[in-house]
Every structure is written in structure tokens, then in C-alpha cells.
Amino acid sequence: KNEIPTLGEVRGKAVLATRFDDKLPVGFERCGLYFGWADQGDRTIRADPTADSVINDRETLCVQDRYNYDVDDKITAIHTCLDNSRAADDTFFLNFTSTSGSGKVGHPKEYAKHINLDLYDYDWQAGTAYGIVIVDFAPKKIAEKIYQTNFQPAQ
């Protein structure tokens, strides 16, 4: 299908997603989901660090991929995207937690240590659709916290 599937529809299956522009010959149809968004590699700090786009020219896509922000600015960008996703049921979110920062630390794994500590302490809400959160060097405890948001809170 050329639309965003539900989790139930894709359980146990692969979903193809691309970001490159595939010029197809006449008569061929694009396969999978096309995620196109503008590069976010500049270091300009923005009140809204996300970029809005569309998936397959139909569904709204919101992406946070500020990969050159320093740790504190990156954490703010991640939180902004997570908080915005709570209020937008009709938008698909991609939230990249990775950064290469200013290069002062030297390796993305060092940045990830700081960001992952913050992610662990974030107020994750059960039953909330955060979209896809892409985490570098994620320890099991963070993966579990994010995974648990897929379930409704106990009554």
C-alpha cells in the first residue's frame, strides 16, 4: 500500500521507506512510503525545530533531525517534538535523537550518553503516540520506556 499502515497491518512485516527522490519510468509506481523533508543540518536555534512535510503527497509528516545542535539545544528540540506529538493525532512524527554537535565532544556516542540520560528521565506517557523516536546507542531501559508508551495506562 502507498499509505501509512497501522501497527496491526505491519506486525511481522517490513515497511519500505525512502527519503531520496526516485525518478521512475513511465508506468511504474513508487513502492513504500516516501518521507521527504528539507535538510536540518544548520545550527540555527529555532523555537520550532521541526520541519513539516508530507508522506506520499498525502499525510502530514513532522521531522526533528537537528543533527548539528549541541547537547542542550538538541535535548530542547527532542522535547519540543515529543511534546508536539502528544497534541497531534493526524500527524506522523520522526524524532531523531542523534547529533554530531559542534564537534567538541568528538563522537556521537559521547553526545548520546547525555541525551539518553535525559530521555530516561523524560515524562513518557502511556497510551501516547510519539511517532518514531530514533535513538543512538539506546540502552535497554530507554527502549523499554518508549515501547511501554504503546499501551494504555492501567485503570
Regions found by a protein language model. Give the residues of each.
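Catalytic cores of phosphodiester-bond hydrolases, prominently lipid phosphodiesterases
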Residues: 1-155
